[in-house]
Amino acid sequence: MAKQVQNFNAEIKQLLDIVIHSLYSHKEIFLRELLSNASDAIDKLKFNSLTHPSLLPENWQPAIRLEPNSETKTLKIIDNGIGMTQEEVVEFIGTIARSGAKAFMQMNAEMKTKPELIGQFGVGFYSAFMVADRVTLHTQKAGSNDGTVWESMGDGTYSLDSVPRPEGTGTTITLHMKDFKEEDEVQNFTDKWVLKSLVKKYSDFIAHPIKMMGETEEETLNSQKALWLKSPSEVTKEEYKEFYQHLTHDWNEPLRTVHYRAEGTMEFNALLYVPGKKPWNYNMRDMEYGLSLYIKRVFIMADCKDLLPPYLRFVKGLVDSSDLSLNVSRELLQQDRQVTQIRKNVTNKALSTLKDLLTKERSAYEDFWTEFGATLKEGLPSDAANKEKLQDLLLFHSTSSDKMTTMDEYVARMKETQKDIYYITGDSLSQVSNSPYLEKLKEKGFEVLLLVDPVDEWVVDALSEFKGKKLQSIMREGLDLDTAEEKQQKEQEKKQAEVTLKPVLESMKKTLESDVKDVVLSDRLTNTPACLVASSADPSAHMQKLMAQMGKEYAGQQVKRIMEINPNHPVFEKMLKASPEQQTKWAEILYAQALLTEGSNLPDPVKFSQQIAELMVQAADSTKH
């Protein structure tokens, strides 16, 4: 095939412009990115060769080589990994269909101050243009005799040519270095001492040897330390941090490091990290998660989901097992009893680590909770076996103070007359903390949990009770706040109010029969005229709202709620004297107000605003007389 010249798509041009012109500092990270890609290519070849042994060349020994040449001002990074077909070269280098590269460009402002983040976005190859004005890539896919040469000057075009690679399978990247001025303070990346120090700094933990010719013979520059096989006492904090950064491309420090060896019926080594911050793509649909799996130090796969439950997807790290078969596949993993045992063990270790953090470093745990609490809560509805451990890790806002509380702390503060653990759900703290549903509970001094994560609706359903105390929504019917003596005292008052307000109750029931199940007197309101509550068997209004956002309807229709009215509010005394037409309008206004109070949308906002305007005019007219 004759040599072709093609244009990068518009987004690649934009990305290259950012890399070439915006990332002024830390130009040295290009080497880390290219070495990491080379290591991944070798890992992929090793993994594919488990099922296709013929892919491996005879006497194959994995290695990455650096060949600097100060005379020609070039640096070659050579690997004998899986290589690429021409189609893959175009897909991975010439276009930008991946979300990571798009996200990289969206975060351009942050990239100017933190260029080391580039690897998180899967576009580390382009960092070569930070130091080179021409990049040549020569690659050949394992199992193929066809090679591809890709070349670009970062100017918006690239060339493609079909040329067999003399070395066979693998990839060679040749960087034709830029001429930097002395004031740019850029290191000489064709200097062997500089390259040695950069490999030590960024890539010492890469599992494959990184080689370069010394004075008389080829030298291995990296230690290839399998940190997880060492005793924890032999590993420094700095080494743990460096390995975490190598593994995750997260250049913050991990919040917690867990390094242990499991022995007994199932033996394996594990090195786990709890991050301090969410990665950029956390919870995106295409986000990969899971631990890296090694078997007898042989890399098998990254992002092995079977080693962790989804609610611990923020945990990073690896497991190295001596007992699993090297021929294991992703499909077989799901059915492997030993993998199930590893998952159980790793889950227990992760949860006990978080419990330890909560107990000993509350402030750090609260920071963790801000980042990953909503994810951890997903375990309550999905992992019954670990329900007790998970419920002890929960933190919630409450009416007690600005500080978050555990369930244990809440129970310890409960008043003697308080029967249940009370909670309210909603969209935001400001909404629920000012809710009229709290009126009676504040009056009695009862603490209420303020639940504002969407997952909380499923959490309270799964939890139902804690240490013998029932969880009770204050937005449901049957809220029992009074003692036996208080009930007895109020019973006569309630009966009298039902008689007095019977015309209002009947009028409202008739007006709102298509909107509510019933209209009854309320025990929970002190200042607000009315509210809506869910019956015990129905979903809350907030749950219905969430289901609608997910594109699901509950039982195919909006579920009616019960309207409670405050018999002591003066509006109902006025309604008793109002005409039937006025009672109808006021009932509609009270229902609309109750919808707003619970955080629901109005079915007819225009009608509501007109009714409020009419009331204002009537109020103004009455003051004239």
UniProtKB/Swiss-Prot annotation:
Region listing for C, in residue ranges: 546-625
GO cellular component: cytoplasm
Keyword Plastid: no
CDD domains xref list: HATPase_Hsp90-like
GO molecular function: ATP binding; ATP hydrolysis activity; ATP-dependent protein folding chaperone; unfolded protein binding
Pfam family, one: HATPase_c_3
Region (A), start-end ranges: 1-330
Cytoplasm among keywords: yes
Region (B): 331-545
Transmembrane segments: none
Family annotation (InterPro entries): HATPase_C_sf, Heat_shock_protein_90_CS, HSP90_C, Hsp90_fam, Hsp90_N, Ribosomal_Su5_D2-typ_SF
UniProt-annotated location(s): Cytoplasm
Domain of life: Bacteria
This protein's UniProt keywords: ATP-binding, Chaperone, Cytoplasm, Nucleotide-binding, Stress response
Family matches, as Gene3D superfamilies: 3.30.230.80, 3.40.50.11260, Heat shock protein 90, C-terminal domain (1.20.120.790), Histidine kinase-like ATPase, C-terminal domain (3.30.565.10)
Coarse class of the protein's main subcellular location: cytoplasm
Family, as annotated: Belongs to the heat shock protein 90 family.
Subunit details: Homodimer.
HAMAP family, per database record: HSP90
Function summary: Molecular chaperone. Has ATPase activity.
NCBIfam families xrefs: PRK05218.1 (NF003555)
Listed name of the protein: Chaperone protein HtpG
Species whose genome carries this gene: Bdellovibrio bacteriovorus (strain ATCC 15356 / DSM 50701 / NCIMB 9529 / HD100)
